[in-house]
């Protein structure tokens, strides 16, 4: 987003892979230095790394700078590794909130965030999006209210150019196959695993089967949560006098009568979860 790249574009895929490669290289280098000082871990001789095979070798992937990797392999063969596993991408919701950034490897779930301070709660619009709109002369109080009424989505706001709408799609608006492909590309440099959340507004047996089969065929060891939404959306949040009028057409006047679990379980395409369908 900061680099103005669409999350599912080839540039984002290349960047994600390069970052993962650098993290893996740095972790191995540090572990090798520790092994030179304190000795390798006791099972190192039984590992594939001792035979010269690192994670990307097991995936059949060629790293970006093979020469430096060969030099690192030589050091590892000489000193070993202090750690048996190096990289695991974990969920970072709490840390991300404290640090004021977004979670881990996920796209943003909305361009609208709720912040809690000692003064109370307030809504905050994605600052990168605000900066982009300001640069193009599109930012105004009316634009802010439109984004808030759309619950953080900008896909239906016609005043916003298509290139911006593409960059600022939310996790619900991105193809999940792209998230899986990003994870698979990172996998060549992750020797433990990664917590990959997937997002689907209306899960069905067909959609889930296709999505998870693609993840399995791509070589993913794990996924994490499947995020879903209730069948009906909650009432829009009002933010000021300009929002005191009636809600947009089609907006429910009250909160959803179903929980996420009920909305999924009551789908005719999900009979296993419904006792009435047994």
Where are these regions (language model features)?
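Short, small-residue-biased leader/transition segments that mark boundaries at the very start
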Residues: 1-2
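Acidic, low-complexity intrinsically disordered tails
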Residues: 233-278
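Catalytic alpha/beta core of large soluble enzyme barrels
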Residues: 36, 40, 62-66, 75-82, ...
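Short beta-alpha connecting loops at secondary-structure transitions
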Residues: 8-20, 109-120
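Short glycine-cluster motifs
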Residues: 28-75
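Short amphipathic alpha-helical coiled-coil/interface segments
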Residues: 16-31
């Amino acid at each position: 987003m900061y680099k103005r790249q669409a999350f599912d574009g080839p540039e984002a895929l290349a960047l994600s892979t390069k970052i993962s490669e650098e993290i893996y290289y740095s972790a191995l280098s540090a572990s090798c230095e520790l092994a030179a000082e304190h000795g390798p871990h006791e099972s190192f001789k039984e590992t594939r790394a001792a035979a010269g095979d690192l994670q990307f070798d097991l995936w059949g992937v060629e790293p970006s700078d093979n020469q430096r990797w060969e030099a690192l392999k030589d050091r590892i063969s000489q000193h070993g590794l202090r750690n048996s596993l190096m990289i695991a991408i974990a969920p970072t919701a709490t840390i991300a909130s404290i640090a004021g950034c977004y979670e881990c490897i996920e796209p943003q779930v909305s361009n609208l965030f709720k912040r809690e301070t000692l003064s109370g709660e307030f809504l905050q619009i994605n600052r990168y999006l605000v900066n982009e709109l300001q640069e193009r002369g599109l930012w105004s109080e009316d634009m802010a209210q439109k984004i808030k009424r759309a619950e953080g989505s900008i896909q239906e706001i016609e005043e916003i150019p298509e290139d911006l709408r593409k960059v600022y799609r939310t996790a619900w608006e991105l193809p999940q196959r792209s998230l899986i492909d990003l994870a698979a590309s990172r996998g060549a440099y992750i020797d433990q695993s990664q917590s990959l959340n997937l997002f689907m507004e209306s899960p069905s047996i067909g959609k889930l089967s296709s999505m998870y089969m693609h993840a399995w065929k791509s070589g993913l060891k794990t996924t994490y949560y499947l995020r879903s939404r209730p069948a009906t959306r909650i009432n829009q949040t009002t933010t000021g006098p300009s929002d005191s009028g009636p809600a947009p057409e089609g907006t429910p006047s009250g909160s959803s009568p179903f929980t996420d679990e009920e909305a999924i379980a009551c789908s005719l395409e999900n009979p296993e979860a419904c006792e009435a369908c047994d």
